[in-house]
From Swiss-Prot:
One of its GO terms (biological process) is carbohydrate metabolic process. Its EC number is 3.2.1.135. The keyword Calcium applies. The keyword Hydrolase applies. It comes from Thermoactinomyces vulgaris. This is Neopullulanase 2. Substrate binds at residues 244, 323, 420-421, 465, 469. Belongs to the glycosyl hydrolase 13 family. Monomer. Hydrolyzes pullulan efficiently but only a small amount of starch. Endohydrolysis of 1,4-alpha-glucosidic linkages in pullulan to form panose. Also cleaves (1-6)-alpha-glucosidic linkages to form maltotriose. Pfam families: Alpha-amylase (PF00128), Alpha-amylase_N (PF02903), Malt_amylase_C (PF16657).
Amino acid sequence: MLLEAIFHEAKGSYAYPISETQLRVRLRAKKGDVVRCEVLYADRYASPEEELAHALAGKAGSDERFDYFEALLECSTKRVKYVFLLTGPQGEAVYFGETGFSAERSKAGVFQYAYIHRSEVFTTPEWAKEAVIYQIFPERFANGDPSNDPPGTEQWAKDARPRHDSFYGGDLKGVIDRLPYLEELGVTALYFTPIFASPSHHKYDTADYLAIDPQFGDLPTFRRLVDEAHRRGIKIILDAVFNHAGDQFFAFRDVLQKGEQSRYKDWFFIEDFPVSKTSRTNYETFAVQVPAMPKLRTENPEVKEYLFDVARFWMEQGIDGWRLDVANEVDHAFWREFRRLVKSLNPDALIVGEIWHDASGWLMGDQFDSVMNYLFRESVIRFFATGEIHAERFDAELTRARMLYPEQAAQGLWNLLDSHDTERFLTSCGGNEAKFRLAVLFQMTYLGTPLIYYGDEIGMAGATDPDCRRPMIWEEKEQNRGLFEFYKELIRLRHRLASLTRGNVRSWHADKQANLYAFVRTVQDQHVGVVLNNRGEKQTVLLQVPESGGKTWLDCLTGEEVHGKQGQLKLTLRPYQGMILWNGR
């Protein structure tokens, strides 16, 4: 047993409360080194002579180097001490505690979770756990009111190829008109990229945080949109651009006019005066040298209060949550206060950050409920679209990503295939619809919350920005209606099968050579097995039936029964076919 590879800490994603009397603990060990992992635990103040409770830690998954184990400690009090008992392949056993490793329990020490406070139990909105999110880029979704079209509005056409300065006239009235379409699709929440006043088509350079952009409509129209969506059971999530403002934002205009005498000079990161908006700016911006997007100094109390007032205003209009742009470049203290504010106004409001990398620093229950899961997207691109990785590597990447976060966060990560910032996934697949469908099936069944970028469901293509922002195709004869029906069916299954929204996830099969991948999601006695043939040829696979699973499984997409024999399921899959199998009592 390689002791140097064994890791645990009594915090973060390795020890976190599920409730005031339940603690989830994880342990990492070298792959294949530990065959049994037990956790012995008691109240922190229990005497050494008292009998310890035992919990068996099951294997949560593996990556290329490590196995990960998880146990749920059912605690009699809110104070916990615990030690691991690890057994190797040859029967060798060792205790592992805060002091280190020892053959004697008393010499290994104990890990301690001092006290489980109710305020530290990470909770997320119940509705979000079962949500299917649909992302709308308002300028390109639907034009419902031509009277507010900006000058130079271009023709809304299937073959449109937008430029960075293109406008097509999409607006909020257009979204209202298309709510029946979205309801038919089955989505339960709409995420809007920015809708506040701004000179650009994308609106990430905010001029007025308290006004709807006139090209999109007005406040009464927005309120109608919220009411109509809510009537259909659809939530509304807005984009908050608090990392930076636009160069037409009132405070920045004041700095441009008054220079060092401006009362707002400390709202921004200005190096010297006068302020220069040339290609070489002397102030911090979004990304690198983007003059139209000056970075806000969010640790400034005045900036913080202004942005909090913005959040209050829009929540008073009835929105259900926020997606936070460039969230990883805003200070943590700001987000902690933001969470307290938002949850005080609406405990059921959802807070989602835009973070493209490991977001564990923001997902411990004190800042965000979720993030846009770009780690998921990277793995999905390389497995389904480009074929850069095989099934075994894919499984390893998924496991490693799951272990980054508490299960409350992992359950609600926004699993996206593409967005307004990326190439369309169908384009990434080289237009291969079979590959695309297989990835969508995975997205709709895997742990997390599916996020659909507008138009994916009817087969829209597009390279990177601005091509990924083409106007939505509304003529049915130009839409891929078969793909639309495929999305509808998968969303319907997701809503119907509790395992797909509430279940844990365990790897079932990962064949490096055949590129076959399977996983199982379980809640109580309900199992859903998902089997994916990520190869352009017909293949047969034998799967061991999970211990608690029955012999007969239902193919949810065909309605046919699949019968196990001698503890195995024999399945034959067409090229790029996915199967969703249900087994329960």
